[in-house]
Regions:
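N-terminal intrinsically disordered, cationic/polar leader segments
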Residues: 1-101
């Protein structure tokens, strides 16, 4: 399970990095050891990280707070929030970052 989780989570973090690395020049993005930090021009910081013990990806957002995402392979093949099954990791990141740039 952990090997499969790490492969899926790493792929997702790579996708997030690729999406936002060239997204807007107002963003500063760092990707180090399974952690992504995205800082907006007005100093809002988003942190996305792999949490291996729980098999989750965690998001710390200055807008909506903390989210824990689990992989939903049954329906959407995406990472959904444990707080609200309608929240997907890429969707919430795009929405919140767009509101800051």
């Amino acid at each position: 399970m952990n090997e499969k989780f790490l492969k899926l989570a790493s792929k997702t973090l790579n996708e997030i990095f690729e999406k936002f690395n060239n997204y807007d020049s107002a963003l500063e993005i760092d990707f180090v050891e399974n952690n992504i930090t995205i800082e907006t021009e007005n100093e809002k910081v988003f942190v996305i990280s792999i949490h291996e013990p729980s098999s989750q990806i965690w998001l710390s957002s200055p807008i909506s707070g903390a989210h824990h995402f689990i992989y939903d392979k049954s329906e959407k093949n995406t990472w959904i929030s444990t707080r609200d099954k309608n929240i997907e990791i890429l969707s919430i990141l795009k929405k919140e970052i767009d509101s800051e740039i």
